[in-house]
Regions:
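N-terminal Rossmann-like FAD-binding beta1-loop-alpha1 element of flavoenzymes
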Residues: 2-28
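Conserved Rossmann-like nucleotide-cofactor binding loop
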Residues: 11, 34, 254
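Glycine-rich FAD pyrophosphate-binding loop
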Residues: 21-41
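Short loop/edge segments at beta-strand edges and connector loops
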Residues: 30, 168, 218-220, 347-350
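Active-site substrate-recognition segment that forms the wall
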Residues: 43-46, 51, 55-95, 222-234, ...
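Dinucleotide-binding Rossmann-like beta1-alpha1 core, especially the glycine-rich loop
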Residues: 44-169
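Short beta-strand to alpha-helix junction loop
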Residues: 103-116, 139-149, 171-174, 188-207, ...
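Helical element adjacent to the flavin cofactor pocket in flavoenzyme catalytic cores
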Residues: 148-160, 179-246
Length: 360
């Protein structure tokens, strides 16, 4: 069968590869001029089944109010007056209970674990090199109360066999010698978590897709799905129609917009995330893997000779404007935990729109 994949981010490229392996003819249609150039471009690079957990959780409303008042805000909500935003937030509130949280956390963990296993198979099969590291994740807790709560809340990790350790700040320096142990009360180490450069992975897998016969159409923005009766028969790119037996939507947030063209409503909302990428200037002071700051919800990830610092959850609608002040938060966290390890003046700021559902 001929299958069109809409979107050439990490989800689209991986979908194309597995469809090719199943014997299908594949065309990938992408609005931008290269693969992984939007949401997959510069994310935090975390491969963390142990950390996979819904945002919609008990107590998140109270936490959110504290975050909104913080000087360095990990959460930004800018009301846009739309019913869509209000409805999405209300739906998320409905998932912030213990029953829904536990169920969704199990699903997310299982999905993340399966995904990581498939990534290992691809890496071995195709000899992919994407700055991958298997050095675990370290989540640091600044406030003593947060650290105590972490120590009391390891049941899920134990029940699901997630290898972990509870570490003192000094013990953390065995894994991250450059970290400032004076800045936090304790840390949770998830031993089997990994890191990698999402964009680099997608670029290399694209080459294998093309070698296997996939066609990539860049600068082809899909405007709507093409219906024949009640069946999707392809996509429309402006005035042009591209026919296919099936269509796979992997267009991030814009999947929601495309489904609306055939009368289907899904609760996907764009949540902006920010990252900065900085060159390392002192190897001894630089992070070795991923370090998560619980208080600021920021991830610091080693990527070759650079460090990627990602975080911020900004709900401000579909506008793609960047807010440079968010860079200050990312710089503050990096310099606080790993002082003088990188050239902050050379920081490259990026913003991507996470496709988020209200269940977290």
């Amino acid at each position: 069968m001929h299958i069109i994949v809409v979107g050439a981010g990490i989800a689209g490229v991986c979908s194309a590869w597995y469809l090719l392996k199943a014997g299908h003819q594949v065309t990938v249609v992408e609005a931008l001029d290269e693969v992984a150039n939007d949401t997959s471009f510069a994310n935090a690079g975390m491969l963390t089944p142990g950390y996979a957990s819904p945002w919609a959780a008990p107590g998140v409303v109270k936490q959110s109010l504290k975050m909104l008042r913080a000087p360095a805000k990990p959460l930004v909500i800018k009301p846009d007056g739309s019913l869509e935003q209000i409805k999405w937030l209300w739906q998320m509130y409905g998932f912030c209970n213990a029953t829904q949280f536990k169920r969704n956390r199990i699903h997310m963990h299982q999905l993340a674990k399966t995904t990581l296993n498939l990534l290992h198979e691809l890496k071995q099969e195709l000899s992919l090199d994407y700055h991958g590291l298997q050095a675990g994740t370290l989540e640091v807790f600044r406030a003593p109360a947060d650290w105590q709560q972490c120590q009391n809340d390891t049941d899920f990790l134990n029940e699901h066999g997630i290898a972990h350790d509870l570490l003192s700040p000094q013990h953390c320096q065995q894994f991250e010698q450059g970290i400032d142990a004076q800045k936090f009360s304790g840390a949770l180490r998830l031993n089997d978590d990994e890191t990698g450069d999402c964009r680099l992975f997608a670029e290399q897998l694209t080459q294998h897709c093309q070698a296997a016969g996939a066609v990539f159409l860049f600068q082809h923005a899909v405007t709507e799905l093409w219906l024949e009766g009640q069946t999707v028969r392809g996509v429309k790119v402006g005035e042009q129609t591209l026919a296919a037996d099936h269509v796979v939507l992997s267009a991030g947030c814009y999947t929601q917009k495309l489904l609306q063209t055939v009368g289907i409503q899904v609760p996907i909302y764009p949540i902006k995330g920010y990252s900065m990428t900085v060159p390392i200037v002192d190897e001894a002071k630089a992070p070795q893997s991923t370090v998560l700051d619980y208080q600021y919800k920021v991830a610091i990830t080693r990527m070759g000779k650079h460090i990627r610092v990602g975080g911020i959850a900004e709900l401000s609608g579909w506008q793609r404007d960047k807010h440079p002040h968010n860079l200050d938060t990312l710089k503050q966290v990096l310099n606080d935990l790993f002082p003088d390890c990188a050239d902050l003046d050379a920081a490259e700021l990026w913003m991507g729109m996470r496709p988020a559902t209200p269940d977290g």
